[in-house]
Amino acid sequence: MDKREEGTVEEPLDLIRLSLDERIFVKMRQDRELRGKLHAYDQHLNMILSDVEETIKVVEKDEETDEEIIRNIKRNIKMLFVRGDGVILISPPLRTS
């Protein structure tokens, strides 16, 4: 029996395969986060996502008080190619039994 038919997870990339055509969360280097629908991926974790919401965390320093100011910048992207070497983690959608 083919494991693709069973929907089982035997290898780490199987979990990503089960998330095809689902919304996923991707944490990237440089304090970037992506949420979007996964259309394709490869063994290097290169991915094609659609309807993406990108959140970038920006830390600025107030020159007068020397306090750090943290801002989140958000933008929406219709279609995005994600290069796998910048990926830290991928979280599949929550599944209910």
Swiss-Prot record:
Protein role: Plays a role in pre-mRNA splicing as component of the U4/U6-U5 tri-snRNP complex that is involved in spliceosome assembly, and as component of the precatalytic spliceosome (spliceosome B complex). The heptameric LSM2-8 complex binds specifically to the 3'-terminal U-tract of U6 snRNA.
Span of domain Sm: 11-96
InterPro entries: Lsm3, LSM_dom_sf, Sm, Sm-like_LSM3, Sm_dom_euk/arc
SUPFAM superfamilies found in the cross-reference section: Sm-like ribonucleoproteins
GO MF annotation: an example: RNA binding
Compartment(s) of residence: Nucleus
Oligomer status and interactors: Component of the precatalytic spliceosome (spliceosome B complex). Component of the U4/U6-U5 tri-snRNP complex, a building block of the precatalytic spliceosome (spliceosome B complex). LSM2, LSM3, LSM4, LSM5, LSM6, LSM7 and LSM8 form a heptameric, ring-shaped subcomplex (the LSM2-8 complex) that is part of the U4/U6-U5 tri-snRNP complex and the precatalytic spliceosome.
Similarity comment: family membership: Belongs to the snRNP Sm proteins family.
PROSITE patterns (UniProt xref): SM (PS52002)
Origin organism lineage: Eukaryota, Amoebozoa, Evosea, Eumycetozoa, Dictyostelia
The protein, known as: Probable U6 snRNA-associated Sm-like protein LSm3
Swiss-Prot/TrEMBL keywords: mRNA processing, mRNA splicing, Nucleus, Ribonucleoprotein, RNA-binding, Spliceosome
First-listed, main subcellular location of the protein, grouped into a coarse class: nucleus
Keyword RNA-binding in annotation: yes
One term under GO cellular component: sno(s)RNA-containing ribonucleoprotein complex
GO BP terms in the entry: mRNA splicing, via spliceosome; P-body assembly
Species in which this protein is naturally found: Dictyostelium discoideum (Social amoeba)
Keyword Transcription: no
